[in-house]
């Protein structure tokens, strides 16, 4: 993927009317979404403080011998655990605050669930990158102050992306730029000393790593989360809005699935493979729900084939939500998924199952065999509506027999009312769902409609009706699927392209310092030929020519000629430049390639040479004692309140005890003042 994105030649970083890529939304704007993110930031800090207090109490309990002290510490530890549980419930309340993200013109529709953006702390790239440029590339790092400032501005802007395609492009631009930065400045054999801290969007617990892959994985997660917010913002009262919502949720599922497949050892619960699998299912379920709304938007005619289609579409939505609820109820996801999300999935599963039975009942009760009716087609549709017909009934006989149709239709109404009752009951059990007024209205209206329809057709002998309505077969005319991110469609210019072509001048390759070669062309003969393009190499060097005597070697890369940078020049351009000096003395600087360094794993967001085990290993649950390449035992994942307990102290302490980065840094010269410098909080979000 990266190879397709490499720039063919240096491009100007500043383009007219293209400055938005360094800008997010105004972080000081008091919008509903910004207030929600600010509350999330405050909660994250409180959770971090509580986790540190619990870790300290556990350490004290471990070393204390006095019984009174131990009893007091145990009491304090119980208070801290209680505080953590309350903070977790508050964070869950933010995650189910769906009203903030819905379209302002939403009317009578069930809200959709968006994902909140992960938060991060500031990172100062300046000192580390300048030192590496001087050490590895033998160039003055201060010549790249503007490029480093651009990178830091871009990262800061990604903390407040706008809720539209521009915001998505901003995040994807930074993700691709991180690929360039990783290739140029992050060798696989050592850590660079940059600490990246990101907060879990579901639990609020911070994770810190010196690995750039944590940064890339978190940016991808935020890209998927932003797509979900775009999807919930779409106007679901219009055909175009619903199509946009379907597309946004499919793209969100694609980004999250790509994250799951690419970064397999993620360091936080919200990016663990199990959690991401559930989130992908949730996005596809919401896309399928939008498909049903798109079909129902023009109105549902009381016509046989239309009702069959709508009933099966509703059954499809109910089926995917039932599968989603089952996935949310499995360990280890169950311990960390917001309870309100699982409850809403269960509510929707019953609600749409009820709609499937309701529409089936209407088509059976109101059906009339009129002259010219295509009974064969209707018989085929009715037979495909069920896996099997009730005992003693056949599709054709049921269509012709009014009594059988009404009895079967009322059986469907009874099942619809049962599902409605279950959806209302499930919604009433969850405090967060009870506070969503539009959800309560939709559920009650649907339940009342089914009840009134049944009352209109109720007869005295209905208790003798022994027909059990079968389940409706789920079917859809538009099967939703993930849409993978298309990074290759986005043109991104490497900020540090002045260092040279990335395929050659990267952190994986070691170079000699530039050597100055002074020589002259004798009778127009340079004494060597050239090969390659950007950069050009010395080839077929005459051992007796002046360039060879001056120290040139075959295979050297030409980086400059008479102070003209040649790293991006083609062979013909370099040859033309050399010949332009005639027989005058030429000063040429060359570098030689040293031995290549070994590569590291590229699919683990937590792999790092020489680092002790971190919080990410809790997610992996890998047994410490098994050091062989054989299959390792998987231990049970920990719940929110069991992080950092005594028996798991070795696994959790390294990440929860976060260092503070406060070293003095040289002033970075920026092109434009950043509005983010006005913020006092490390993790302020829009």
UniProtKB/Swiss-Prot annotation:
An annotated GO cellular component: plasma membrane
Modified residues (Phosphothreonine): 655
Key words of the record: Coiled coil, Cytoplasm, Phosphoprotein
Keyword Iron among record annotations: no
Cell compartments where the protein resides: Cytoplasm, Perinuclear region
Ranges for region Interaction with Rho: 46-66
UniProt cross-references to Gene3D superfamilies, sorted A to Z: 2.30.42.10, alix/aip1 like domains, HR1 repeat
Span of domain PDZ: 515-593
Biological process annotations from GO: glomerular filtration; negative regulation of stress fiber assembly; signal transduction
Pfam families (alphabetical): BRO1, HR1
Tissue distribution: Widely expressed. Highly expressed in prostate, trachea, stomach, colon, thyroid and pancreas. Expressed at lower level in brain, spinal cord, kidney, placenta and liver.
Residue span(s) of domain REM-1: 26-100
Function according to Swiss-Prot or TrEMBL: Binds specifically to GTP-Rho. May function in a Rho pathway to limit stress fiber formation and/or increase the turnover of F-actin structures in the absence of high levels of RhoA activity.
Family, similarity comment: Belongs to the RHPN family.
Subunit record text: Interacts with GTP-bound RhoA and RhoB. Interacts with both GTP- and GDP-bound RhoA. According to PubMed:12473120, it does not interact with RhoA. Interacts with KRT18.
Protein name in the entry: Rhophilin-2
């Amino acid at each position: 993927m990266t190879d397709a994105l490499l720039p063919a030649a240096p491009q100007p970083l500043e383009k007219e009317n293209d400055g938005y890529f360094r800008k997010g939304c105004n972080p000081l704007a008091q919008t509903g979404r910004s207030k929600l993110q600010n509350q999330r930031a405050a909660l994250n800090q409180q959770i971090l403080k509580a986790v540190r207090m619990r870790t300290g109490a556990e350490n004290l309990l471990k070393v204390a011998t006095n019984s009174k002290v131990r009893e007091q510490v145990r009491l304090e530890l119980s208070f801290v655990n209680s505080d953590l549980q309350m903070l977790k419930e508050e964070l869950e309340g933010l995650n189910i605050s769906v009203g903030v993200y819905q379209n302002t013109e939403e009317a009578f529709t069930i809200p959709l669930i968006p994902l909140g953006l992960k938060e991060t702390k500031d990172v100062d790239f300046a000192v580390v990158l300048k030192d590496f440029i001087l050490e590895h590339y033998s160039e003055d790092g201060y010549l790249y102050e503007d490029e480093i400032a651009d990178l830091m501005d871009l990262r800061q802007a990604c903390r407040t992306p706008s809720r539209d395609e521009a915001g998505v492009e901003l995040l994807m631009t930074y993700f691709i730029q991180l690929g360039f930065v990783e290739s140029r400045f992050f060798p696989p054999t050592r850590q660079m000393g940059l600490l990246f801290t990101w907060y879990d969007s579901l639990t609020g617990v911070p994770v810190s790593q010196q690995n750039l892959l944590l940064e890339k994985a978190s940016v991808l997660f935020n890209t998927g989360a932003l797509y979900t917010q775009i999807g919930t913002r779409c106007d679901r009262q219009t055909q175009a809005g619903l199509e946009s919502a379907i597309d946004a949720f499919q793209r969100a599922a694609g980004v999250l699935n790509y994250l799951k497949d690419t970064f397999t050892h993620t360091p936080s619960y919200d990016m663990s493979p199990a959690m991401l699998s559930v989130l992908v299912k949730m996005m596809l379920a919401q896309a399928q729900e939008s498909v049903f709304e798109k079909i129902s938007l023009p109105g549902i005619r009381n016509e046989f084939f239309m009702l069959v289609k709508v009933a099966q579409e509703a059954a499809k939505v109910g089926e995917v939500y039932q599968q989603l609820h089952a996935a949310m109820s499995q360990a280890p996801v169950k311990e960390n998924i917001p309870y309100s999300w699982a409850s809403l999935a269960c509510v929707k599963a019953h609600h749409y199952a009820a709609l499937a039975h309701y529409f089936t009942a209407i088509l059976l009760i109101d059906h009339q065999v009129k002259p010219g009716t295509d009974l064969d087609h209707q018989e085929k549709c009715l037979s495909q509506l069920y896996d099997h017909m009730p005992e003693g009934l056949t599709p054709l006989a049921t269509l012709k027999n009014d009594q059988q149709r009404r009895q079967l239709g009322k059986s469907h109404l009874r099942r619809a009312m049962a599902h409605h009752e279950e959806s209302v009951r499930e919604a009433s059990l969850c405090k967060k769902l009870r506070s969503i007024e539009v959800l309560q209205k939709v559920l009650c209206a649907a339940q009342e409609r089914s009840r009134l329809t049944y009352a209109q057709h109720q007869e005295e002998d209905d208790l003798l009706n022994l027909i059990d309505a079968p389940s409706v077969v789920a079917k859809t005319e538009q099967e939703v699927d993930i849409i993978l991110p298309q990074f290759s469609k986005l043109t991104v210019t490497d900020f540090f392209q002045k260092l040279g072509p990335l395929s050659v001048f990267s952190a994986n390759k070691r170079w000699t310092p530039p050597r100055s070669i002074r020589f002259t062309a004798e009778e127009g003969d340079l004494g060597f030929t050239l090969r390659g393009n950007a950069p050009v190499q010395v080839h077929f060097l005459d051992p007796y020519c002046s360039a060879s005597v001056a120290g040139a070697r075959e295979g050297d890369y030409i980086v400059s000629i008479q102070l003209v940078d040649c790293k991006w020049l083609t062979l013909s351009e370099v040859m033309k430049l050399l010949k332009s000096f005639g027989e005058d003395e030429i000063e040429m600087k060359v570098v030689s390639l040293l031995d290549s360094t070994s590569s590291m794993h590229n699919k683990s967001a937590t792999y790092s040479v020489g680092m002790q085990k971190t919080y990410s290993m809790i997610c992996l649950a890998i047994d410490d004692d098994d050091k062989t390449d054989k299959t390792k035992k998987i231990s049970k994942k920990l719940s929110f309140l069991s992080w950092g307990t005594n028996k798991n102290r070795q696994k959790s302490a390294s990440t929860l005890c976060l260092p503070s980065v406060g070293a003095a840094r040289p002033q970075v010269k920026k092109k434009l003042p950043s509005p983010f410098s006005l913020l006092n909080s490390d993790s302020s979000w829009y």
